[in-house]
Amino acid sequence: MSAPVTTIAEIGKHEGQSVMLRGWLYNMRASGKLLFPQFRDGSGIIQGVVPKNAVTPEVFESVKTLTQESSVIVEGKVRADKRAPGGYELDVANVQVVQRVAESDPYPITPKEHGTEFLMEHRHLWVRSQRQASILRVRAEIIKAVRDFFDERGFTLTDPPILTPAACEGTSTLFPVDYFEEQAYLTQSGQLYIEATAMALGKVYSFGPTFRAEKSKTRRHLTEFWMVEPEVAYAELDDLMDLAEGLISFVVKRCRERRRADLQAIGRDISKLEKIEPPFPRISYDEAVKNLQEGHAKGALETKFEWGGDLGSPDETYLSAQFDKPVMVHRYPAKVKAFYMEPDPQRPELALCVDVLAPEGYGEIIGGSQRMASYELLVQRIREHGLPEEAFKWYLDLRKYGSVPHGGFGMGIERAVAWICGLEHVRETIPFPRMLNRLYP
């Protein structure tokens, strides 16, 4: 009877037993009559041990001549070893080669250092590296945690369209698509549509791709990214801030609990993630402006920030670096925000909105607001922004038939992954990043 098939992630359940692994050769070391092949299977990496005197000559030679990324089925006995990265090694008894990578055309990504451009050209192979695989597993955990958070709190998943007839916030950064004899656009946000489903279902969220034709080359920008967007009927700004605080805390805790090994493999300082617990600091836009102006006076910021402007990346980085938790900046000037945001009744020049800035200088990961409930005021804002009123007729209907205070926010998955994993650039947060200068592979 053949040994049971298992995964490297589950190998600890089989200590002292013979098992079968199906995967690829990740790396190889040799020391005299001992071979130390490293195998990966998508769930992790384990070191095998092959003493020449413990296996047949054919098996020893087969392992010795394995090339990097050759696909293999390995049989061996699981042995606990505290020195091993995962706490276990595999005493190899037999190896079946499924496909041997040809020596004449070797795997291009070797253990040596490679430039970013080379790695991006070979992204379809780069994702196999230990670091990239760990990042993608953390990404999957974040997405699962987000869904669990909303599902457990009575939210209904709803799916807004990818092809839209109009922009959520203007057309300057939209990707146009020919839609038969009409002009359509790839969605920038599902928000307007999930406002409609929130009026039907109460508490909803969407999760899907969004597209921004921004000609930005910063470490924070992708042209295609994934966003989760909750929307809640009968919600005001404080409710939304509480919800965002709960979501972030839940997601980070889940990653600490379930993806600690992957975070360690990436080199993340997990002690910084241990601090992500409610309550989060909340500061007004006015307080943020004062803070930024003091930073400029001290020489920490090149440009003096003036009241009325939107926060740029250097401003977000400066502010968020002062806190060891996400900081919530609320009530921005309405003129720098989207047309649909509810004005502050105390100061109508401000919008009831919030941006959540991740610590360690990572900047905005969530942006949200209370939505405008008044039909007349929304019509006025659409006109002020020079938007086509006819295109928003259906959206205005929501204010005619049982309008209520409501709101929501969007959280970019890639920026959340970058922060939680401690990454320099968002290009590593998604399997195949789309950027200003990157459409391949």
Regions found by a protein language model. Name each.
Residues A3-A233, A418:
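Class II aminoacyl-tRNA synthetase-like tRNA-binding/catalytic domains
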Residues Q99, V251-C255, E424:
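Conserved NTP-handling cores and scaffolds of large molecular machines
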Residues S134-V138, Y185, E236-L240, F280, ...:
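Catalytic cores of large soluble enzymes that bind and process phosphate-bearing ligands
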Residues P160, A167-T173, L247-G361, E384-V404:
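Metal-assisted phosphate- and nucleotidyl-transfer catalytic regions
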Residues M199-P209, T218, L222-E236, R256, ...:
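TRNA-recognition modules of translation machinery and tRNA-sensing kinases, especially anticodon-binding
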Residues A235-E245, V289:
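Extended, domain-scale alpha-helical bundle/helix-rich regions
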